[in-house]
UniProtKB/Swiss-Prot annotation:
PROSITE patterns: AA_TRNA_LIGASE_II. Disulfide bonds: none annotated. This is Aspartate--tRNA(Asp/Asn) ligase. Its EC number is 6.1.1.23. ATP binds at R229, D230, E231, Q238, E491, G543, L544, D545, R546.
């Protein structure tokens, strides 16, 4: 059977739209064959399009030619069918299908295209290697759950655009080919043919351009924009990603945060029907680190960190008191009801925190009589043990876990252990949406290996006004006018009030170890622009991929991106990146020095 043309046929309804009210109507449907079943005198075809599946029946009594064609139909063939909608007979209604009350008796069938046998079934809940799915992404995207993810992404984008339009924002595109100003991840570079030896960079964000748009008097800007970072891909990162980018003039931090939480609440309502209470709770960076060991804490469960440093400072356990003497701290987590953990289970937890550079994991097992079982208990007085139990809110049957180290190591290790235990003990409630603003970040963080400060967010973040005098004398103590939005332990957006004065921006560059010459070379255009009446301004950027992933209940952003890259930044479908013709390189005055792989 050869392929036919549509030849004047026009779809009248989508497959998933058919219901009881269409009974008796003639419809024209188009889609793919999900499955075909031959029941002797009748052939049943489940026809699928992006809206869903409907059962089509071919009977020789209705049309002999259509029935004959249907005998040759196979999975994933592309069909057009014309027929009458009938209610299904008693006992054949399928409650698992949205269209399960009806079926279409076809009198016309056109084979629009044939299909090879797919390498995996086109259905949900398949056990298929992800690389195979990415290799045949066009088939993977046919699956209903992928259709739902793409539709959800579309609805989220539309909701965002509608909200921002209603609040006076202008959607303005910024350049994709721009100047390389590396201050974090590596740039993707694009050679210029007409300017030999010079390169553009693909933007890591539109940061500079959106600030310049505020200088230009646009006042409210937004863009749903592609951004690029040539970084070593950690878990669930992409070299190209989509950002909801916006900026506002004449605002304070609360103005930006207040409007953005309204927008996110509207997006949640529009896309998944979830009502978000506003205002969203605020937590300072310091409190987040102290209580949760993370600047993006998941607040759906407890297991908060408790500081026992003052209690343990004078104890007889050398590891603890020497840590305190060296400027470190001791914090713990109360794993409620986990006193029954075996030694191997505790050793596994010790190995877990070692990944985060913790040198060990001390523990107290609280026995049923309230006594403590621990190899280190002998180094503590009864009063110290009682004080620790009180601080940790310990009860019989609990397991107290402690890390003694530098504050950064304590936070990283116990913060990760907190989440690990919550997952293992199934303490994380499903269907809960805990949003949080984290504020008052440090402006800078010191890298001892590099021997200098780096911006915790980016170099254009404004210092807290009361901390400005410290920018030259004690930059590590300066707080930023920055704010991150966190959802269930995932950072979904971050922003700040920006620097809008040249003198402060130059002080910031100086604090980052940048000479005047280097600052002028990289950001001279920005510094010059500040001299022409820059308004106070601030903004924020949300990661659209991560936001949609959470809305969809997925575990990976790859499941909400149509054509994602692998962890090695490759596209398995197109085989990008790839070698190019030497003539193309010659035009660009470029020669590859990459080692040539020997063929086997």
């Amino acid at each position: 059977m050869s392929a036919e043309s549509m030849n004047g046929l026009h779809r009248t309804l989508y497959c998933g739209e058919l219901h009881k009210q269409h009974e008796g109507q003639e419809v024209t449907l188009m889609g793919w064959v999900q499955r075909r079943r031959d029941h002797g005198g009748l052939i049943f075809v489940d026809l699928r399009d992006r809206s869903g599946i409907v059962q089509v029946v071919f009977s020789p009594e209705v049309d002999q030619e259509a029935f004959k064609k249907a005998e040759g139909v196979r999975n994933e063939y592309v069909l057009a069918v014309v027929g009458r909608v009938n209610g299904r007979p008693e006992g054949t209604i399928n409650p698992n299908m949205a269209t399960g009350e009806v079926e279409v008796y076809a009198h016309t069938l056109r084979l629009l295209n044939r299909a090879k046998t797919p390498p995996f079934y086109i259905e949900d809940n398949i056990e298929v290697d992800e690389n195979l799915r990415l290799r045949y992404r066009y088939l993977d995207l046919r699956r209903p759950e992928m259709h739902k993810a793409m539709m959800l992404r579309h609805r989220a984008s539309k909701s965002i655009r509608d909200f921002l339009d209603q609040h006076g924002f202008l959607e303005i595109e910024t350049p994709m080919l721009t100047k390389s100003t590396p201050e974090g991840a590596r740039d993707y570079l694009v050679p210029s043919r007409v300017n030999p030896g010079k390169f553009y960079a693909l933007p890591q964000s539109p940061q500079l351009f959106k600030q310049i748009l505020m200088l230009a008097g646009m006042e409210r800007y937004f863009q749903i924009v592609r951004c690029f970072r040539d970084e070593d891909l950690r878990a669930d990162r992409q070299p190209e990603f989509t950002q909801i980018d916006l900026e506002m003039s004449f605002v304070e931090a609360e103005d930006v945060m207040g409007l953005m939480e309204q927008m996110i609440a509207e997006v949640c309502s529009d896309t998944i029907g979830v009502k978000i209470s506003t205002p969203i709770p605020r937590l300072s960076y310091q409190e987040a680190m102290d209580r949760f060991g993370s600047d993006k804490p998941d607040t759906r469960f407890g297991l908060e960190l408790k500081d026992i440093t003052p209690i343990a400072a004078q104890c007889g356990f050398k590891v603890f008191n020497s840590t305190v003497a060296g400027g470190g701290q001791i914090k713990g987590i109360n794993a409620k009801g986990c006193a029954s953990f075996s030694r191997k289970e505790i050793d596994d937890l010790t190995a877990f925190v070692a990944v985060y550079k913790a040198k060990g994991l001390a523990y107290f097992i609280i026995n049923e009589d309230g006594s403590v079982k621990s190899a280190i208990a002998k180094f503590f007085t009864e009063e110290e043990i009682a004080a620790i139990k009180d601080k940790m809110e310990a009860q019989p049957g609990d397991l107290l876990l402690f890390v003694a180290d530098k504050p950064a190591v304590v936070a990283a290790s116990l913060g990760a252990l907190r989440v690990h235990l919550a997952e293992r003990l199934e303490l994380i409630p499903q269907g809960m949406w805990n949003f949080l603003w984290v504020t008052d970040f440090p402006l800078l963080e010191y890298d001892s290996e590099a021997g200098r400060f780096f911006a915790m967010h980016h170099p254009f973040t404004s210092p807290a006004e009361e901390d400005l005098p410290l920018l030259e004398s004690n930059p590590g103590k300066v707080r930023a006018r920055a704010y991150d939005m966190v959802l269930n332990g995932v950072e979904i957006g971050g922003g700040s009030i920006r620097i809008h004065r040249r003198d402060i921006q130059e002080l910031m560059f100086k604090a980052l170890g940048m000479s005047q010459e280097e600052a002028k070379e990289k950001f001279g255009f920005m510094l010059e622009a500040f001299e022409y009446g820059a308004p106070p301004h601030g903004g924020l950027a949300f990661g659209l991929d991560r936001l949609v992933m959470l809305l969809a209940g997925k575990d990976s952003i790859r499941d909400v991106i149509a054509f994602p890259k692998t962890a090695s930044a490759t596209c398995l479908m197109t085989q990008a990146p790839d070698v190019v013709d030497p003539a193309q390189l010659a035009e660009l005055h470029i020669r590859s020095t990459a080692p040539v792989k020997k063929s086997n």
